[in-house]
């Protein structure tokens, strides 16, 4: 596997409203574990669309991993131009910082938002251009990642395409592990 697409919930879907929420570090730890294992297995590129939440936290994790594995690259392919236009200023600054550090940035449609079709096209291209999908996703709570996860599963039924998931139970395990380590 050379290229993995990563996605997951937006912050509000997780009840997270600030990047310093303790849940963010837990999610980043889970992402770090998975991505590091994939890098050790030959992963070269991580692709995201730049959504707030799991995708931008993934970018932060990639930047951390690049210290030890400098050949790992991050690409941000936005579904449309200026997706951050309606965001709060602090979120826009955070997003612009991530874009400034990414190895490649491009917009799939090269136009501003016009319709939900741009998201469908983004999902289609992400699945076509990647070897696997990693999603912070639980079928019990579908949310915004539902459509790309469904597209990945369909591709997996006809081709050698894998979907990997970080479930809520995985995050709970990390929380319990942290509590155990802090109790010692």
UniProtKB/Swiss-Prot annotation:
Q: Which InterPro entries match?
A: YspA
State the PANTHER family in the record.
Answer: UPF0398 PROTEIN SPR0331, UPF0398 PROTEIN YPSA
Similarity comment: Belongs to the UPF0398 family.
Q: What is the protein's name according to its record?
A: UPF0398 protein BA_1582/GBAA_1582/BAS1466
- The organism encoding this protein is Bacillus anthracis
